[in-house]
Amino acid sequence: MKEQKWIHEGLITESLPNGMFRVRLDNEDLILGYVSGKIRRSFIRILPGDRVKIEVSRYDSTRGRIIYRLRSKDSND
C-alpha cells in the first residue's frame, strides 16, 4: 500500500541551492521543500513569493516535495 501524504499550500520564502526552497505553510510551519521531477522537467520557474502546493510525508514533517506552483492573482496574462 502506498504511503499517505498530506498536501498543504504555502509561500516560498527563500531559495536555496540545488532546487531546494524554504516554504512557510498556511498553518505557519516553516519546512524545507524540493522540486518534484515533473516540475523540473517542465522547466517551471519557482521564485521567492510564489504560492505552491507541497506534499509532506507523515513520517518527516520537516521536508516536502513541491508538486504544483499556483498562479499569482496579479499576473497580467
UniProtKB/Swiss-Prot annotation:
Gene3D superfamilies tied to this protein: Nucleic acid-binding proteins
Provide the alphabetized UniProt keywords: Chloroplast, Initiation factor, Plastid, Protein biosynthesis, RNA-binding, rRNA-binding
Q: rRNA-binding: is it a keyword of this entry? A: yes
* Pfam families found in the cross-reference section: eIF-1a
Q: Does the keyword Signal apply?
A: no
**Its domain of life?**
Eukaryota
Q: Which GO terms describe its molecular function?
A: ribosome binding; rRNA binding; translation initiation factor activity
Task: Report the function annotation for this chain.
Answer: One of the essential components for the initiation of protein synthesis. Stabilizes the binding of IF-2 and IF-3 on the 30S subunit to which N-formylmethionyl-tRNA(fMet) subsequently binds. Helps modulate mRNA selection, yielding the 30S pre-initiation complex (PIC). Upon addition of the 50S ribosomal subunit IF-1, IF-2 and IF-3 are released leaving the mature 70S translation initiation complex.
Q: How does it assemble?
A: Component of the 30S ribosomal translation pre-initiation complex which assembles on the 30S ribosome in the order IF-2 and IF-3, IF-1 and N-formylmethionyl-tRNA(fMet); mRNA recruitment can occur at any time during PIC assembly.
Question: What family does this belong to?
Answer: Belongs to the IF-1 family.
Q: What is the name listed in the Swiss-Prot or TrEMBL entry for this protein?
A: Translation initiation factor IF-1, chloroplastic
Give the organism the record lists.
Answer: Platanus occidentalis
Q: Which gene encodes it?
A: infA
